[in-house]
Amino acid sequence: MHMSLEVLEQLESKVQSAVDNISLLKMELDELKEQNNKLQDENHQLRNEHVAWQERLRALLGKMDQMGESI
């Protein structure tokens, strides 16, 4: 009887350790998901800014071309 109680305690300890580890991994996953969402938002914003800069540069180059043609 003593042996099976010891085995049960070891099993209980391993299960608790696994549960604790899973809880930590879930918290880490939640943090990574949140960080990923922030990075996706930042990426989207930077892409929009990049497009806006490209449009402004094209407009400026167009004006320079018009000036060159009128000279």
UniProtKB/Swiss-Prot annotation:
GO terms for biological process: division septum assembly; FtsZ-dependent cytokinesis. InterPro entries: Cell_div_ZapB. GO terms for cellular component: cytoplasm. Residues 5-67 form a coiled coil. Gene3D superfamilies: 1.20.5.340. It is found in: Cytoplasm. The keyword Cell division applies. Non-essential, abundant cell division factor that is required for proper Z-ring formation. It is recruited early to the divisome by direct interaction with FtsZ, stimulating Z-ring assembly and thereby promoting cell division earlier in the cell cycle. Its recruitment to the Z-ring requires functional FtsA or ZipA. Belongs to the ZapB family. Homodimer. The ends of the coiled-coil dimer bind to each other, forming polymers. Interacts with FtsZ. This is Cell division protein ZapB. It comes from Aeromonas hydrophila subsp. hydrophila (strain ATCC 7966 / DSM 30187 / BCRC 13018 / CCUG 14551 / JCM 1027 / KCTC 2358 / NCIMB 9240 / NCTC 8049).
